[in-house]
Amino acid sequence: MMATYEGCYTDAQALRIAVVVARFNDLVTGKLLSGCLDCLARHGVDTSSNSEQLDVAWVPGAFELPIVTQTLALSGQYQVVITLGAVIRGDTPHFDVVVAEASKGIASVSRETGVPVIFGVLTTDTMQQALERAGIKSNLGWSYGLQALEMGSLMAVLRSATSAS
């Protein structure tokens, strides 16, 4: 019989979550974090300042997201890590380098550790586009929080199913 595995958004109390936020472009990343925390709180995650369920780490920029994400994932304390950043195109190739290295680094953390890592790094041509994605039109931070809940839950289901067989 074919098995179907899905995560859910309702079992958030069982998850311990880390959020790694890039300080560069903090006008945008702060809004992403607010949206993310709002989503998590509305789904039952304790987001208070004395939470035992959630930790937030700030890094200088998107380029530094992978190493801190990897450190947190390897700690064994978290079932899912969310990365938040905003890289906005400028007049030099710096944008391409930062985006490529941050995305490759973040993806490798998930593969190497088995901990789901949510890629919440906006890559836009303008500040206006970034702000539209962080709250003016919608807040993708909310979506990243929802993805974290689903992936954390799905991984628990998969681990339970594979250990039972």
Curated annotation (Swiss-Prot):
Keywords: Riboflavin biosynthesis, Transferase. The active site is at 94 (proton donor). Its EC number is 2.5.1.78. One of its GO terms (biological process) is riboflavin biosynthetic process. 5-amino-6-(D-ribitylamino)uracil binds at residues 24, 62-64, 86-88, 119. One of its GO terms (cellular component) is cytosol. It comes from the Bacteria. It holds the Pfam family DMRL_synthase. Pathway: Cofactor biosynthesis; riboflavin biosynthesis; riboflavin from 2-hydroxy-3-oxobutyl phosphate and 5-amino-6-(D-ribitylamino)uracil: step 1/2. InterPro entries: LS, LS/RS, LS/RS_sf. (2S)-2-hydroxy-3-oxobutyl phosphate binds at residues 91-92, 133. It catalyses: (2S)-2-hydroxy-3-oxobutyl phosphate + 5-amino-6-(D-ribitylamino)uracil = 6,7-dimethyl-8-(1-D-ribityl)lumazine + phosphate + 2 H2O + H(+). Belongs to the DMRL synthase family. Catalyzes the formation of 6,7-dimethyl-8-ribityllumazine by condensation of 5-amino-6-(D-ribitylamino)uracil with 3,4-dihydroxy-2-butanone 4-phosphate. This is the penultimate step in the biosynthesis of riboflavin. This is 6,7-dimethyl-8-ribityllumazine synthase. The gene is ribH.
